């Protein structure tokens, strides 16, 4: 029987980048909110989503869930030295303003807020209206 060599895979520790200015991309849909903090080139420093924090079902789409996601992502990015962000908001969800306020409350200086929601030039057919 051949001896199987067990090579231990060492996980590289995340090095602390020293980035002071960056971007916050907030994607707020009807079902979830995702907050990604990047440097100015677009390389992700940290991200968090409402679903990833344990919110499930209808609680996932609340402003409070978006606030918690933004707070979690901001704390992780501030470990890399992030101080000020430009905020780009995408989507029609309820967590847009809550996420921006949460970034400010976490200690990040918001220098710009821009809505980058994609608007179709009569592209795909929208989902049918709900009859409740």
Swiss-Prot record:
List, in alphabetical order, the Gene Ontology terms for molecular function in this entry. rRNA binding; structural constituent of ribosome
| InterPro entries xref list | Ribosomal_uS11 (IPR001971), Ribosomal_uS11_bac-type (IPR019981), Ribosomal_uS11_CS (IPR018102), Ribosomal_uS11_sf (IPR036967)
The keyword Ribosomal protein appears for this protein: yes
What are the BP-aspect GO terms? translation
Name a single GO cellular component.
ribonucleoprotein complex
What Pfam families does the record tag this protein with?
Ribosomal_S11 (PF00411)
**Keywords, alphabetical:** Ribonucleoprotein, Ribosomal protein, RNA-binding, rRNA-binding
Sum up the protein's function in the record's words. Answer: Located on the platform of the 30S subunit, it bridges several disparate RNA helices of the 16S rRNA. Forms part of the Shine-Dalgarno cleft in the 70S ribosome.
Subunit comment: Part of the 30S ribosomal subunit. Interacts with proteins S7 and S18. Binds to IF-3.
Entry similarity comment: Belongs to the universal ribosomal protein uS11 family.
The identity of this protein, by name, is Small ribosomal subunit protein uS11
